[in-house]
Amino acid sequence: MTTIKTSNLGFPRLGRKREWKKAIESYWAKKISKEELDQTLTDLHKENLLLQKYYHLDSIPVGDFSLYDHILDTSLLFNIIPERFQGRTIDDDLLFDIARGNKDHVASALIKWFNTNYHYIVPEWDNVEPKVSRNVLLDRFKYAQSLNVNAHPVIVGPITFVKLSKGGHQTFEEKVKTLLPLYKEVFESLIDAGAEYIQVDEPILVTDDSESYENITREAYDYFEKASVAKKLVIQTYFERAHLKFLSSLPVGGLGLDFVHDNGYNLKQIEAGDFDKSKTLYAGIIDGRNVWASDIEAKKVLIDKLLAHTNELVIQPSSSLLHVPVSLDDETLDTSVGEGLSFATEKLDELDALRRLFNQNDNFKYDKLKARYERFQNQSFKNLDYDFESVRTSRQSPFAQRIEQQQKRLNLPDLPTTTIGSFPQSREVRKYRADWKNKRITDEAYETFLKNEIARWIKIQEDIGLDVLVHGEFERNDMVEFFGEKLQGFLVTKFGWVQSYGSRAVKPPIIYGDVKWTAPLTVDETVYAQSLTDKPVKGMLTGPVTILNWSFERVDLPRKVVQDQIALAINEEVLALEAAGIKVIQVDEPALREGLPLRSEYHEQYLKDAVLSFKLATSSVRDETQIHTHMCYSQFGQIIHAIHDLDADVISIETSRSHGDLIKDFEDINYDLGIGLGVYDIHSPRIPTKEEITTAINRSLQQIDRSLFWVNPDCGLKTRKEEEVKDALTVLVNAVKAKRQE
């Protein structure tokens, strides 16, 4: 049989039990020294490298490990430092300040990484002097070598890096050309250190606009050819199909393609002869974004097809394994579902099984995985019938009529204030929840604690002067995991954590079966909170699109079917809240934009399905019940009309980290529904000033009708400290009170 090689694009940073997160947050809290942080992270990086070596990968990535974000690492590598942070030593503390902000300066913008739930720190080009200033990549490569690990460096490529940047007076092409000598310098340093090849991530080349980048892409890689480094470069794409004929014409040593999320196009291009056989093909055949075990037999068939059209083949995951949990080893799952799962470590095992089969004619591990997959597939998880047609998908009356009834019922002031939903999850809150889950305290003791915490924060909100209150979500660990624990058809793991942004980790539930609402999920806590105040308290739910996008979805049903199943379940909870007397119900959809396919040909259907699912979840309420929704961290221009079509009475949107850019999206649409554009950044410990909030309000009112405008933070306050929250909300309310007097 033909020999194949195995590789990886990236490995999770978090650690099996979030050691990475805990160390970084301990350093921020001044509980450990910088030396202790460095040692902990070095040990974790070593563990990651040696684990991948254990699974006989022919090449192991370095440069994927980071203290915060790999795009921010690249910014610091090339001295792309935001102007407000310039003049300081380029070190880890500067990196953290750019990412989080400090008492003097706001953080850089935080944006979704393509259509995933990972977020990157946006590079800023205003008044920068690019140069190679901090070559951590070289240091990490040499460290891997010291462990006798056959490593390859990973770096985001110049086309993608610049496209994901903002600011500066240069054109896109000029910025790329500015960076080319710097990339060359970095490449040369890595090659001189012994790098056999360098993985250059260019996922921007799978997007709709990729053809418009082809001229500058060719110019860039021709430059690298003239510098005698191009043959050591592998252009890596993922998340969608690439224009293979163009990529094959570039003078690089290899190409990386996604054969999982490409809708079959990349294989068709290979079979059509579009791949240059003089290059190495890095084939992403194992799903890097979902947790289901591979159909190992189908992967063997795919490899056979690829071998017929290549001279050198490397198999690997479809993308970095950053997007999946580390390992199943510590889980205690029902075998009926557990046998069908594969986390990052298990995906390496799948690669090893295929390597052994093709290179050594050793089918032991292959046969074992094949039998396991077949056992899982022989089970039935399609057991319920649904009546989608009987549920309303539009409100009874237009917004103009609804808002009159809602205002009469709620009696809200000019520029009403509210928060997005969650309040700080203190160590005490987390301890009580953990003790309850592990049966160390009784249900009664836990409920008493929750009620006390709810009551305390209702009073805090009233004292500050907010107009629409929330109960604080102290019973929830995560806005999706909470619903996954309570809805039928979901599985929640114990250690299935993935990185969302910075040290923020989430534990996505796994949808394995038909989704069903079986009992009220949030009614008790919300009704209790409402009993403590005359002000309206919002019911807080997560919408069907977000629950699906932030879960690991089942793959045996179309996405739309699963999404609508979730919508029916949320609709049941919405009606239960309304029946219990809750006047305002928020159904959050922060992930609606992130799920938008990278190719525009799929946008219309995705948005149509998303809008219908949201309406399925929210349209059955009476006119006087006010429906809110919330979205965050997104570039909304492409979907602004779909946002309007949701017909939510009020939508709140993150704008603070976009530094006002988002408001431009409303210039082309007459947005005639209620809206709150977040006026300060909750992801930073920095307390906003009254002037900053007033400026944000004034800018928003240039585009938004004052009678429709709400004032709120840009996201939930779960990750902030109590004093930070109280101080920031006090500033917000005082700014609004002053504005009302104008």
Curated annotation (Swiss-Prot):
CDD domains: CIMS_C_terminal_like, CIMS_N_terminal_like. It is an enzyme of class 2 (transferase). 5-methyltetrahydropteroyltri-L-glutamate binds at residues 18-21, 112, 550, 594. It catalyses: 5-methyltetrahydropteroyltri-L-glutamate + L-homocysteine = tetrahydropteroyltri-L-glutamate + L-methionine. The keyword Endoplasmic reticulum does not apply. Binds 1 zinc ion per subunit. GO terms for biological process: methionine biosynthetic process; methylation. NCBIfam families: met_syn_B12ind, PRK05222.1. Belongs to the vitamin-B12 independent methionine synthase family. Catalyzes the transfer of a methyl group from 5-methyltetrahydrofolate to homocysteine resulting in methionine formation. This is 5-methyltetrahydropteroyltriglutamate--homocysteine methyltransferase. It comes from Staphylococcus aureus (strain bovine RF122 / ET3-1). The lineage of its organism: Bacteria, Bacillati, Bacillota, Bacilli, Bacillales. The gene is metE.
